[in-house]
Amino acid sequence: MKVIDQFKNKKVLVLGLAKSGESAARLLDKLGAIVTVNDGKPFEDNPAAQCLLEEGIKVITGGHPLELLDEEFALMVKNPGIPYNNPMIEKALAKGIPVLTEVELAYLISEAPIIGITGSNGKTTTTTMIGEVLTAAGQHGLLSGNIGYPASQVAQIATDKNTLVMELSSFQLMGVQEFHPEIAVITNLMPTHIDYHGLFEEYVAAKWNIQNKMAAADFLVLNFNQDLAKDLASKTEATVVPFSTLEKVDGAYLEDGQLYFRGEVVMAANEIGVPGSHNVENALATIAVAKLRGVDNQTIKETLSAFGGVKHRLQFVDDIKGVKFYNDSKSTNILATQKALSGFDNSKVVLIAGGLDRGNEFDELVPDITGLKKMVILGQSAERVKRAADKAGVAYVEATDIADATRKAYELATQGDVVLLSPANASWDMYANFEVRGDLFIDTVAELKE
């Protein structure tokens, strides 16, 4: 990693632990900062805080005392999940203390070139695809960021022989200042996380931070299926490289079943290793990045053909007596479920849907669920999802939880059918996160096979 001295002997407050806060605290300590960690979880139930204290880092746990900010901190590094209306953050900003996320730290120390990927849907799959293609080409892609590996931790081991491939959420991008990727990708922009950002425009502005420091020598890969992306293309200093499944563009595009980059066929769409129209978009974004990094077509084709997907993202789980089970628990909004369904014959699909009720109706989903074999509906949003099913003329049963839903879906399916968990809702009404929900689906499928 680059050795920098801008934090040496500076007092820094790390607000919130989890993986990113723990990594940031250790990195700042290594860089000579005087670090204080503040986390809301009580010390006795906080293994991360206990470890940091043993390493000589000051920790304050069990709450967020505002008087802590009476100390003269030069910087706050916050956990990305903590909203900006948190009183600690509001007070820090009022005092003129910069508030960053650990993504900024990763950029400052990274010896490796950075490719940043953000968007509403497809981030993790696209990040993983890019990482695998670059690694196959000898460019040693290291995945980090929102994909589960703290960017500031991975950046410490990255050299100029690596490429840092970073999945970035809107929460993370709100806390960057100098962050400057060589290539950035925005997969798409949909109205999600409005409960955090308040307005869609604020959400878009957070995502747009990814390109703030980019210049003409840098590349911004945008999804020209969206008019919004076309509008944004004129507002960046970066060189825009578009991708599209709807039209021929000066970048990566789909035409007559083939994936092209600037007029040259790279591979056929049906050769991609994972189904769904959304994965065609993910593959096109990957192709654009790979070609910009000089990767040959054969390597791209071989890697994307062998790509097995990402856990909880249209993940093939198992086949039981001719019934295939797919785990798409990451589909926490309508668009994601629409794209998941596009990869299957509706007449052979038993869809499991429903979850956290955010107050939105599901009328947009009606054309996509029309013709489904059956639905299994659960969660807080069940009544709203049932109304959409009624409008689509789809028969359904209700379930109490994911295990019950999986068993009922299997009972409704016959040989040649697909049981698809693609909830179109967040998981928080029943489960801590979409991973827990998806893992329970996987576990229940395993029980059914016994």
From Swiss-Prot:
Main subcellular localisation: cytoplasm
Key words of the record: ATP-binding, Cell cycle, Cell division, Cell shape, Cell wall biogenesis/degradation, Cytoplasm, Ligase, Nucleotide-binding, Peptidoglycan synthesis
Pathway assigned in UniProt: Cell wall biogenesis; peptidoglycan biosynthesis
Alphabetical GO biological process terms: cell division; cell wall organization; peptidoglycan biosynthetic process; regulation of cell shape
Binding-site residues, ATP: 119-125
Alphabetized InterPro entries for the sequence: Mur-like_cat_sf, Mur_ligase_C, Mur_ligase_C_dom_sf, Mur_ligase_cen, MurD
SUPFAM superfamilies per the UniProt record, alphabetical: MurCD N-terminal domain, MurD-like peptide ligases, catalytic domain, MurD-like peptide ligases, peptide-binding domain
Gene3D superfamilies per UniProt: Mur ligase, C-terminal domain, Mur-like, catalytic domain, NAD(P)-binding Rossmann-like Domain
Enzyme class: ligase
UniProt xrefs under NCBIfam families: murD
HAMAP family: MurD
Protein name as it appears in the record: UDP-N-acetylmuramoylalanine--D-glutamate ligase
Lineage: Bacteria, Bacillati, Bacillota, Bacilli, Lactobacillales
